[in-house]
C-alpha cells in the first residue's frame, strides 16, 4: 500500500476516487499504429488520405476532427463553417463525465514539448493563483534534481488560442476546478524502450498523487 515509500495509497483510496480515461482519441491511436487502413469508412479514409498528412503526424479522429479543439468552450472557434462543438462521440463522452462528476481537478497527459500547462478561469483571481501554485508544485515534483526544473511552466488565458475548444479549458469553465496538461516529448519507438523513457515516466507517474495530497 506504499508507493515510492512516500504515498500511503490505502488511506488515499479510502477518501478519494481517481478516474482514468486512457485514450481520448482511440481512432488516432489506431491510425498511428495501422495507417489509414484502420478507418473502416472508405469515404473518410479517402478524404484523410487526400490531405497528404502522414499517419504518424495525424492528430484527428476517423472523421478528421481534432478532438482537442472540439469542446464547447466559451471562446470556441470554428475552423470550417460546418464544424460544431461537441460534434464527436468521444467529446460527448468526456463532457458527460465532467457533468456527472465534476471532481476536484483534471490532469491530462499528452505528447508535445516538455511542459506543465495550467488553465485560467475568467474573473477568478484567487482560483488562478491557486492553480499557479499547484502548477509550480507539480513542476518541482517532476524534477529528478530539485534544483533543476525539467518541465517548463506555462499558463493559458480563457481567451487564449491554446484554450479554444480544449477539454481542460472546458473543464475549468463548467466545473470551476483546476485543470492542468502535462506534456512530454514525442519520440520514436527506439526511444520508447530506452532508459530515458523510464526516467521520463518516473518524473510524472506520481503527479496525480501529489495533486490529491496537496488539496
What positions do the PLM features span?
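C-terminal accessory segments enriched in acidic
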Residues: 71-215
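Active-site/substrate-binding loop(s) of hydrolase catalytic cores
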Residues: 1-127
